[in-house]
């Protein structure tokens, strides 16, 4: 059984999520201890528990310690349940997108349909529009197709969002994402839920004002939804290059003007573009698992503490040679033995 110190590196939920993903894919059981030991509220929190339960559902896993506050977890996966329909209700505004990140690598070619309820646009996790505009499109570039339907949006603290994931298929091998290539255009989605529509327009206009200096076509659509359970707003942007995609997002919050939300996302996007990387700082972390599973290389915007943590967990589960160089940007290469 693989032993993992949960206080290693950044010591957060990323260690657990990466371990769950790779455990289900490889069939290797693990025990993680000192879970979130260095955090103000140590142990498993509700959002982490749902990642455990989601992966338990798809792999018929045996678990010990899967309860709120637990500082130790044993996870023993069995065969993945293909050709199945799974419903996951995180409750309130637990992050749907973090659950998606954990599950998607494990359900490739498994003919599964997964419905997740919770928070689609919440702090400290990618927004659902970033997932749709950037994450899924990068996966498509490396050879993984999928269908993701956003049924309802969910914001903090009420949640109420709903997403359906299905038809995750592909057979990527030894891919290469080393540059963005010529910048073609900027795409985006500016949204509001149960708030005035002008907020979405102001977010969009603010972002466009900053991005106009890039000299390319800008297409930011607005998504206005009234009658949702939770109130909120946000914007996600994607810089479409000839060879890759760079993304950024920002969420509204009480007291934060719509113009600031749009400006924040636009400046994040430009900051990532200035690194001359092929993928942005968030995708740099998320692409590491796929590269290690299928072989390949990419240039990411910045080597974060999450990335270091991911690398160490990957080495515990996979027989793979990892080469890494640089910091901002950095190059990650994985060769499968």
UniProtKB/Swiss-Prot annotation:
The keyword Cell division does not apply. The keyword Nucleotide-binding applies. Keywords: ATP-binding, Cytoplasm, Ligase, Nucleotide-binding. The active site is at 306 (tele-amp-histidine intermediate). It holds the Pfam family RTC_insert. Its main location: cytoplasm. It is found in: Cytoplasm. GO terms for cellular component: cytoplasm. It catalyses: a 3'-end 3'-phospho-ribonucleotide-RNA + ATP = a 3'-end 2',3'-cyclophospho-ribonucleotide-RNA + AMP + diphosphate. GO terms for molecular function: ATP binding; RNA-3'-phosphate cyclase activity. SUPFAM superfamilies: EPT/RTPC-like. One of its GO terms (biological process) is RNA processing. Its EC number is 6.5.1.4. InterPro entries: RNA3'-term_phos_cycl_insert, RNA3'_phos_cyclase_dom, RNA3'_phos_cyclase_dom_sf, RNA3'_term_phos_cyc, RNA3'_term_phos_cyc_type_1, RNA3'_term_phos_cycl-like_CS, RNA3'P_cycl/enolpyr_Trfase_a/b, RPTC_insert. ATP binds at residues 101, 282-285. It is an enzyme of class 6 (ligase). It comes from the Archaea. Belongs to the RNA 3'-terminal cyclase family. Type 1 subfamily. Catalyzes the conversion of 3'-phosphate to a 2',3'-cyclic phosphodiester at the end of RNA. The mechanism of action of the enzyme occurs in 3 steps: (A) adenylation of the enzyme by ATP; (B) transfer of adenylate to an RNA-N3'P to produce RNA-N3'PP5'A; (C) and attack of the adjacent 2'-hydroxyl on the 3'-phosphorus in the diester linkage to produce the cyclic end product. The biological role of this enzyme is unknown but it is likely to function in some aspects of cellular RNA processing. This is RNA 3'-terminal phosphate cyclase. It comes from Saccharolobus solfataricus (strain ATCC 35092 / DSM 1617 / JCM 11322 / P2) (Sulfolobus solfataricus). The gene is rtcA.
């Amino acid at each position: 059984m693989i032993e993992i110190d949960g206080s290693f590196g950044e010591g957060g939920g990323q260690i657990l999520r990466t371990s769950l993903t790779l455990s289900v894919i490889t069939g290797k059981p693990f025990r993680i201890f000192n879970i979130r030991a260095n955090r103000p509220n140590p142990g498993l929190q509700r959002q982490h528990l749902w990642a455990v339960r989601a992966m338990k559902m798809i792999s018929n896993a045996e678990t010990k310690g899967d309860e709120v506050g637990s500082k130790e977890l044993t996870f023993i996966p069995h065969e993945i349940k293909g050709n199945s329909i799974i419903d996951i209700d995180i409750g309130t505004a637990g992050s749907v997108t973090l659950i998606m990140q954990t599950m998607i690598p494990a359900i490739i070619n498994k003919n599964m349909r997964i419905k997740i309820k919770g928070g689609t646009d919440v702090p400290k996790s990618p927004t659902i529009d970033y997932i749709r505009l950037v994450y899924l499109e990068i996966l498509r570039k490396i050879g993984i197709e999928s269908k993701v339907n956003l049924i309802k949006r969910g914001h903090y603290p009420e949640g109420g969002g709903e997403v359906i994931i299905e038809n995750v298929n592909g057979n990527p091998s030894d891919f290469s994402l080393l540059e963005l290539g010529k910048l073609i255009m900027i795409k985006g989605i500016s949204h509001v839920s149960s708030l005035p529509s002008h907020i979405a327009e102001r977010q969009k206009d603010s972002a466009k004002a900053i991005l106009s200096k890039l000299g390319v076509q800008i297409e930011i659509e607005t998504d206005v939804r009234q009658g949702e359970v939770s109130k909120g707003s946000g914007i996600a942007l994607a810089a479409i290059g000839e060879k890759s995609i760079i993304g950024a997002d920002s969420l509204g919050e009480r007291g934060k003007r719509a113009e600031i939300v749009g400006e924040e996302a636009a400046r994040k996007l430009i900051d990532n573009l200035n690194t001359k990387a092929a993928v942005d700082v968030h995708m740099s972390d998320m692409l590491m698992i796929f590269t290690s599973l299928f072989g390949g290389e990419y240039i990411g915007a910045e080597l974060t503490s999450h990335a270091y943590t991911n690398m160490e967990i990957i080495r515990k589960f996979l027989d793979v040679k990892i080469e890494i160089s640089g910091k901002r940007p950095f190059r990650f290469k994985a060769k499968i033995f």
